């Protein structure tokens, strides 16, 4: 469908809805009338001219906004022509209207990508670089030269950061003498640069599998910038400008770009079509993106201002996936009391995209891997969360953008907070609380391993004690950035809890409305500063709107890194009827922890109700006394009021008769970023699991019970698994804990069928014969969906049951094989792809190491019948999934994991070629990710793969450098950094000169994406710390900071967590969390 097809409607112009006029504001002139439907669009509006009025910047002062460049861009016109997707090239003509900020400006510094060739770099080019029509001298600068003599992080990172902080511009243009008079009078001038983009390795993705769906699109690299890869610009978030994007393309190609389509006409000379987009909201180059391809345009059926663009044949999937986009926009508009900031929203689906949605002003570039059809129910919630997060970024991220890199956490954290409100509204409080706990665990884990995260450094010139420097986008570690954004979300939520939800939303409304007002001042560029946000300006808005002073909040959680670690003990004083609490803190140097001073909330659940107290923390050791409101229990059962106000009947026979305390919780509302270890008798944890209604409390109870189960714990866990009123994540977490507890108790599985198998048969077995599962009949209601997810999780927990010898229980594999054999989806309206994948993953988890390992692998004729059956099942599933693919190839990935597990456990010969076959670019991206993850798992965790390890590692590093798909390139260093081949030390098996040289080459390769380069610096630091590798002449033990290792899931387990509800997360996560401080019982156990 061409744009002209949609222009026949009276409500549309050039395929897009007429932009709705902005809401009238007091004192503002009335909006201009919209373009008439029948009016010709061939008459383009005049080119963007320099604003005629330049007002003083002091009048529109915004705290923290500092001009980095010596000039300001007012408008930019970009024309793209001669696009050739097969040769990966196109021509770009850029015209920039800029205003000098200094009278003594003699040189213009701009950003330009390495593969964006200047006229003097193109043989035979007659193009020039001109300023107001006068030819200029220019040169390209390479700040990667002469970076480090020694091959160590300590010699590379400081030099690289200093060069980038001083001058990170690649293009230097000398201002001709003829123009200097205008510069001296600070008059706007026009710069024109013609470039040719050829085979860019980053920032642009060309997809040309076949001519029917070839396309090209932009993506952010490394994190927020990326426009420099395709045009000359100031690729900085504070350089707001008005934009005009022009595309001259073949008739079969359709562009979609930031801004509104203002013109579409045929070029008579060559038969091409000319499209012109205008972005009239001041926008930085970081938020300008586009995509070109054989897209089909579809207006959203419920909203005339939302458009989707799909590749041929994907229209039904796109329509189904984006069905609720209009409701998401309405949700955010209602919460923020503010209209959507752009006239239209365009959503384009592309192949070979990064895993995240690429967000530009009024444009979302979404990977096709997110698409699903109406028979898929497993990924709906995850996809909607990603979509609403990307829409929230249109408000905070595109309209309101950060002034500098280190303020980026503010808009993204606000967008994540808005997403959490959507999750709480649509998916429930329990899901929102579970995600909150997971974010807290991830942040504390990162800080303990790598170092403290400082959201906004108090002194931007002072280096942070980390192995890489996060103060610049091109030197920040991708793992650090990911953890920083999670910590930012937790901090933003803490702020909201302190000032209240309504005042916090008023702050966001104030920021948006001021930004929208200032964006309409097209002739006053100084006013555009209010579209920028900084830490100072945001918190000043908080104070001015709410009237609440929060200086300690800034100093404790924003300007300072680290998290608090509390070790809590308490005793009940029966004579005084009080609880005596002792709280210790640990802030040992280098472990990511910091000492907290301030209030701390404590909830004491007594037999007469729950009571909240606030105690003061003033040092490393604090003591407090809390009065109890109840006496010791007098009866066996009693109705007890909970914190939620609900009254439930509790069996009090297991508690201490002299104490009225049922359990104690510290900081239940997550008002701090912290780790907490509470030492209390096991019956407190059991009561908490059984009767507490907060998901976080139940998760904490399960973690503690798993670490130190009592004789009574097993029945409590069984009740948790069977209780259908419990949140489904608690139920399947309890199933994994039950498996762990039973595996520890040698007498647990001596006789009889495991209790989890009986529970599964009772819940999901046929009434006639419980050993045969019922036919699938998935129903999309809240309760039935939870049952469905539990049905997926129970077999995975059952598969991990082991005897004392380490062998799988004899009932497990026949049970799983029966589930696969008798699975019937013939009458079900929904797909069972994910359920079948869960069964094959369970079968893979049931495989245990062979006795003969590592001596030899048995001959095929000597394999037992059980192993033959497993091989047959996995092979059949893998082949059938190749012939008739499941959604996202989830069944094939599970079957491949099973064959890998058989190799790893010694039943099949080690053969990496099987995995490399499925990592080929011709395979779908989900299978490729699975295969590469398993290869990395073999490199890291298989001690018997020594013969293939170095070859596999070499091929993986080569793939990271040469792979076309950016999602694959970025995944490899992330997995290697999370689960390095070996830990740091002189016994490092990766300590070979070849490996060290290869890694160092990747760490200093200026051609690859900076987030990939920084990712390999994480790997390098994990292996060699800050020093040079011993194989290259470095010390055996490097001085300086080291990575503090904790128990992390292996790469294969990490892959299992890719789905938001996947129970593989519960199997793979560390459990219990670190107990290296404040838990003497655990330390003795270890």
Curated annotation (Swiss-Prot):
The entry's keywords: Nucleus, Transcription, Transcription regulation
InterPro entries assigned to the protein according to its UniProt record, in alphabetical order: Aminopeptidase_N-like_N (IPR045357), Aminopeptidase_N-like_N_sf (IPR042097), Peptidase_M1_dom (IPR014782), Peptidase_M4/M1_CTD_sf (IPR027268), TAF2 (IPR037813)
Compartmental location: Nucleus
Compositionally skewed regions (Basic and acidic residues) per UniProt: 1067-1078
Keyword Transcription regulation set for record: yes
Segments of skewed composition (Pro residues): 19-36, 44-53
Molecular functions (GO terms): chromatin binding; metallopeptidase activity; transcription cis-regulatory region binding; zinc ion binding
GO cellular component, one term: transcription factor TFIID complex
Deletion consequences: RNAi-mediated knockdown causes a severe loss of RNA polymerase II large subunit ama-1 phosphorylation.
Polar residues bias spans: 1-11
Region (Disordered): 1-53, 1064-1086
UniProt record, GO biological process: embryo development ending in birth or egg hatching; transcription initiation at RNA polymerase II promoter
Summary of subunit composition and partner proteins: Component of the TFIID basal transcription factor complex, composed of TATA-box-binding protein tbp-1, and a number of TBP-associated factors (TAFs).
Functional description taken from the UniProt entry: The TFIID basal transcription factor complex plays a major role in the initiation of RNA polymerase II (Pol II)-dependent transcription. TFIID recognizes and binds promoters via its subunit tbp-1, a TATA-box-binding protein, and promotes assembly of the pre-initiation complex (PIC). The TFIID complex consists of tbp-1 and TBP-associated factors (TAFs), including taf-2. May regulate RNA polymerase II activity and thereby may control transcription initiation by RNA polymerase II.
Classification via PANTHER family: TRANSCRIPTION INITIATION FACTOR TFIID, TRANSCRIPTION INITIATION FACTOR TFIID SUBUNIT 2
Membership in a protein family: Belongs to the TAF2 family.
Protein name: Transcription initiation factor TFIID subunit 2
Organism: Caenorhabditis elegans
